[in-house]
Amino acid sequence: VSAVQSPADALPGVAAPVHRIGGHLLVECLIAQGVTHAFGVPGESYLAVLDGFHHHADQIRFIINRQEGGAAFMADAHARLTGRPGVCFVTRGPGATNASIGIHTAYQDSTPLVLFVGDVASDTRDREAFQEVDFCSFFGPSTKGMAKRVERIDDVARIPEYVARAFATAMNGRPGPVVLVLPEDMLAAVVEQGAGQHRAPQALPYLDAVQAWSDPGSVRRLRELLLQSQRPLVIAGGAGWTVQAAQALQRFAENWKLPVGNAFRFQDTFDNHHPLYAGDVGIGINPKLAQRVRDSDLILAIGPRLGEMTTGGYTLLDLPQPRQKLVHIHASAEELHRVYHADLAINATMNAAARSLEVLTAPPLLPWEAWSQACHEDYLANLQPQQLPGDIDMPTIVALLQKHLPPDAVLTNGAGNFASWIHRFFRHHGLAKGYKTQLAPTSGTMGYGVPAGIAAAITTGRVVFTITGDGDFLMNGQELATAVQYGAKTIIVLLNNGMFGTIRMHQERDYPNRRAGTELRNPDFAALARAYGYAGVKIGTTAEFEPALLAALERSEGTLIEIALDPEVITTRGTLSAITQAALQKAA
């Protein structure tokens, strides 16, 4: 990169940098790692980087968000869709603390992400300067759940080293977020051109994630455990799955006729239409599938951490050693035996593990074929809805989505009972078909779905559908302005029941008829969407939904469809009143 003015910057009345500065070198390093989009909210602390984005606008796009939490969620979504670390830029102090919700989400969801934080100048550090925060303490490993690594770059010449290490750390082992702190004066410092044997700092080459392979002895032992089994069950999910890995998993399942359940909010890992699909193992699990997990004699956990949500609050598998034989395959050795003691623990990335499994030869006769068929029949039976009150029939709404959305549509959600309708009734075609279709936070983060959907539209250009609730939407609804600014079309269905529904449900379960802190007085969401530049539609009956959806698919701009949902319709299986009555009877 030339240190002199580039033709792109040679505009009348526009000053261009004469020297190559740290902010420009940083952007060059991002480009070298294949970054095409960075998300963030601008700040004075990293003006030199913003100038670098201007200088390299033909190679990388900086997406301006309206709040740093939304920016971090968009970077997270971009990473899940591309398999490469998402990139987010925020300023010091409140910018970084706002972004922390997205960093925690990326950590719990094992999403590779690099957060760049503009910081106070070096000569004012440790004086509690304006907006100063000790980011190593705030994000660091001592927080046990925020970032994999936190580093400050004090020497402009070492920017390439730190950026490359951040990307490697974010991708390898258990993927996750890395934070790089950028002192303002370091970014503005001139990058020396080098003399003699000392070369000028340059971006380091593109890095791929390192593949960890299963050792042959472990794979042979896995086959032995399969041959000893009568009721095996695969639970697949977690981070690091590619199209090729999902295809290899499907071939492995087909060769051995194994039933496959997808881990919590990784429902696109295995094709939901496949005759071996058993359902999703997570919140609101099919009771019959929960019993299948308990009754199985061999669990093959391929990819998931086996956290609280996938294990039904650590009840589906006994702690610390399950009754079932347990094979746990994970990309990070630190996750193996951390919660559950596995009979066989295999440290391998999903690409490598699935390729090792697909070549395992199965015997001609398998004793569990009827078991596998019954697992799938249980799943199909769970698609049949219960009769619930009100003018909106949510299973029919989901069936219409299934009918009209293209197979590669991306579905996003935040946190709330509203998501359970999609989780139970929508059937993903699976990553093996060539595309990722689900963006959902396993950390249960409210406000994720709207910005994630916008990032999906920007990243893929595919149809994007977001389901949200009245409480969830107002956490990050301001990002509709970002969507309109960048022409990102999403279709949003907002279920408005006038309360924080999940909390109210649990409130009635534990403290029946003693509501507090859960009722909401809401704005006119359709009018609010129109104010941002979306089409805004309100419906009150099931019959109104299909024409509203078809019109949304035809529009060039995004659409928000507000649905007034009866507060009684609190879950896919029952009513709020029934939960209250059950709690009162229990207390009597």
Predicted regions and their residues:
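Phosphate/pyrophosphate-binding active-site segments
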Residues: 2-17, 157, 224, 323-419, ...
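Glycine-rich phosphate/diphosphate-binding loops that line cofactor/substrate pockets in enzymes
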Residues: 4, 25-35, 77-83, 169-174, ...
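Glycine-rich, acidic loop regions that bind phosphate or pyrophosphate groups
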Residues: 5-7, 11, 117-161, 184, ...
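Conformationally flexible catalytic loops at phosphate/diphosphate-handling active centers
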Residues: 17, 165, 169-228, 363
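Active-site diphosphate/adenylate-binding microenvironment
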Residues: 23-27, 31-33, 41-44, 49-54, ...
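A short, small-residue-rich loop immediately preceding and capping a beta-strand
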Residues: 30, 36-40, 60-63, 81-120, ...
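Active-site nucleophile and cofactor-binding loops and adjacent substrate-binding regions
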Residues: 41-43, 62-73, 88-95, 154-157, ...
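Thiamine diphosphate
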Residues: 116, 124-133, 276, 283, ...
